Amino acid sequence: MRLPFQALRAFVEVVEAGSFTRAANNLFISQPAISKSIRELEALFEVKLMDRSHSPVILTDAGNALFTLSKNIFNIEKVIIQDLSQRSQSRLGSLSIGASTTIASHWLSHYLVEFSRRYPAVSISVLSGNSQHIAKLLKNGEIDVGVIEGPIPNEPEIQIINWRKERLVLVAAPHFLEGNTMTNLSALKWIMREEGSGTARVTQEYLTKLAIQPVSIIRVANNLAVLELVRAGLGLALLPEIMIKEKVMHKELVVIPETLIGMEPFIERELNWITLTWRHETPLRKNFKEVLFNFPLA
C-alpha cells in the first residue's frame, strides 16, 4: 500500500479549514477534487473519516487518528525541506578540520570564531598533530580539510594551496645568551620538534642552509614543550613569531641578534590549505575556506 500524499494533504486542509469549500480555495483546486480525495482515503483504509453533514466537519475516531498522523508527516516534510535547504547553503552540518600543532594553537581560533558567528548551527571538530599526521587523516577520510605547515611531498592525491606565510625566529633565554658564545652555533644545544613536523623540517632547512651541524639535539612533540625548554635555558630553537612575541616583550626570551651570529635569525615558511584532489568541494568547506583566506587578522 502506498500513501496518496495529495489526498492526505487535501484531508488535512479540510479539517483545518473546517469545510470542503474553504479547503478547495486554499489549495486552488475544485471542491469535487477535494471530495474525491476524501473518498479515495476512505476507500483505501475502509473506514469513515468524517461526518460531512456538519460545518465544520466532525471527524470520526479514525479521522482524528489520520489527521494527527498526517500532520506529523507534513511537519517532518517541512523539517526535511528546511534542513536540506540550509545544508545546501552551508548553514547546517558538520566540519572536521585537521590542523598542524602551531596552527591549531595560535592561528585557527581567530577564524573559527568568525566562522561560528556566520554559521552558528554548524558543528566543528578540530584534530591536531604534525603535518604528516594531518595528511594521513585527510587521506583516510577522518577530516574534511587540513591546514598545515609546509608542503607534503609525494602525495599526488592531495591538493595544496598556499594560505599565508609564517616567520620562525631564533630565540633563547636571556641567561643562555649571556652564558654562551654565538660564534659556533653547531656547538650549542638545539631544541627541535619531532620528525614529521613542519617546524622540524623548516628548522633543518635553516641549519642546512647555514651549514650548522648541532652536536646535541633535544626533540620534543610540540612547540609548547620546545618553548618551555628554551625558557629554562636548555638551548636554542626556531619558534613561530606569533608564539614568542609576548615572551620577548616580557624579556622571558630574546631573539638572537644578527650581529652575534652573522646571519638572519629567522626563516619564513608557508602555511597551506590541503584537500583531496578527487573530493567535491561542498558549500560548507567552500565557506570555511572563504573565512580562512579572506577574514582579516585583528
Describe the residue ranges of each PLM region.
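Flexible hinge/capping segments at coil-to-helix
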Residues: E157-E195
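A late-sequence structural motif
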Residues: W107, V254-A298
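Short helix-boundary/capping micro-motifs
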Residues: V12-S30, L95
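Central regulatory/effector-binding core of bacterial HTH transcription factors
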Residues: L92-E155
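Secondary-structure junction motif
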Residues: E149, E178, L188-L210, H280-V291, ...
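Conserved amphipathic alpha-helical core elements
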Residues: A23, L41-E42
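Hydrophobic hinge/microswitch elements
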Residues: N130-A135, K139-E142, E149, T203-I256
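A short LG(V/I)-centered, amphipathic sequence patch enriched
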Residues: E42-D61
